[in-house]
């Protein structure tokens, strides 16, 4: 039975309690072999097989928990992290933390948008205009970098309605597909910040057992991400075409070459390769003489 008492020797990780990022974090931990007892009614969860406890909090609370040393690790969108950091620095507060790794989920962009009928050429068109946003510090930095004065209107939700409601001329908000902007009669005109989820650590040194666990998690996360970006490929190749076929398959290491039973002219080739443009690559492999091409997903990798 899992001990659910908060203990100082557990590695404490802050995660968003709801939403897509929360789901992606749960999947990542599972892929890394961390077994968590999730309970939607509880804000603290515990790992069954490792000394880890999860604090499930609001996403905008995670940077502060890291900056203040309350938790050891956090997974957070870079947009939220940088907005909080800029806000604290504007208040002359010291901000220290370690950014360990960018993750392969949580993609979004922070963009400027205006009414679809507005004429817009560049950010200078927003000079002295009122812009509604939930990210005032990221917006201010971008506008300052471009030498544009503006009026900021802070909204913590429903930013898209600001132009139609007469609250602001433009908005600066997170965009994924752009469907919400279109539904509200807006058009995206400038991307000011691109973001992914990232893993961060508090600045104060961890005790050796905790740091060893962090290092173990980092190795596993790297393996999960590399596996997601790669495929295991098996094929048959004429011996005289090996060099040409190998050149078409840039893998993480040299391919494994195996003899084929009762066939002295061909060999079997096994390789881990990137999936990028792989349909085109398969066609090139076939043209080069490869056959019996098999592409398999990889669940885990460790170099």
From Swiss-Prot:
Q: Kindly state one GO CC term assigned in the UniProt record.
A: cytoplasm
Instruction: Give compartment(s).
Output: Cytoplasm
For the keyword Flavoprotein, the answer is no
Give, as one word, the top-level EC class.
Answer: transferase
| Gene Ontology molecular function terms on file | ATP binding; ATP phosphoribosyltransferase activity; magnesium ion binding
Q: What does this protein do?
A: Catalyzes the condensation of ATP and 5-phosphoribose 1-diphosphate to form N'-(5'-phosphoribosyl)-ATP (PR-ATP). Has a crucial role in the pathway because the rate of histidine biosynthesis seems to be controlled primarily by regulation of HisG enzymatic activity.
PANTHER family named in the record: ATP PHOSPHORIBOSYLTRANSFERASE, ATP PHOSPHORIBOSYLTRANSFERASE ATP-PRTASE
Per its record, how is this protein called by name? ATP phosphoribosyltransferase
């Amino acid at each position: 039975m899992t001990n659910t008492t908060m203990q100082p020797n557990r590695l404490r990780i802050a995660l968003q309690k709801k939403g897509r990022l929360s789901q992606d974090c749960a999947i990542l931990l599972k892929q890394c072999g961390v077994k968590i007892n999730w309970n939607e009614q509880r804000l603290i969860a515990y790992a069954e097989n490792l000394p880890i406890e999860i604090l499930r909090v609001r996403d905008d609370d995670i940077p502060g928990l890291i900056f203040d040393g309350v938790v050891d690790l956090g997974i957070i969108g870079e947009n939220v992290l940088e907005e909080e950091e800029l806000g604290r620095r504007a208040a002359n507060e010291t901000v220290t933390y370690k950014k360990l790794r960018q993750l392969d989920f949580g993609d979004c962009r922070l963009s400027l948008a205006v009414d679809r009928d507005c004429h817009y050429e560049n950010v200078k068109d927003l000079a002295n205009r009122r812009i509604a946003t939930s990210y005032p510090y990221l917006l201010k930095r971008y506008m300052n970098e471009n030498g544009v004065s503006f009026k900021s209107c802070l909204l913590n939700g429903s930013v898209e309605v600001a132009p139609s409601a007469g609250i602001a001329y433009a908005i600066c908000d997170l965009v994924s597909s752009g469907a919400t902007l279109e539904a509200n009669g807006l058009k995206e005109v400038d991307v000011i910040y691109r973001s992914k989820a990232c893993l961060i650590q508090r600045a104060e040194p961890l005790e050796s057992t905790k740091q060893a666990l962090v290092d173990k998690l980092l190795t596993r996360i790297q393996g999960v991400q590399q596996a997601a970006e790669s495929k295991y490929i098996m094929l048959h190749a004429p011996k005289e075409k090996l060099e040409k076929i190998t050149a078409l398959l840039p893998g993480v290491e040299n391919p494994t070459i195996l003899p084929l039973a009762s066939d002295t002219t061909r060999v079997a080739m096994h390789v881990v390769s990137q999936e990028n443009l792989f349909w085109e690559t398969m066609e090139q492999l076939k043209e080069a003489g490869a056959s019996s091409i098999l592409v398999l997903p990889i669940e885990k990798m460790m170099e």
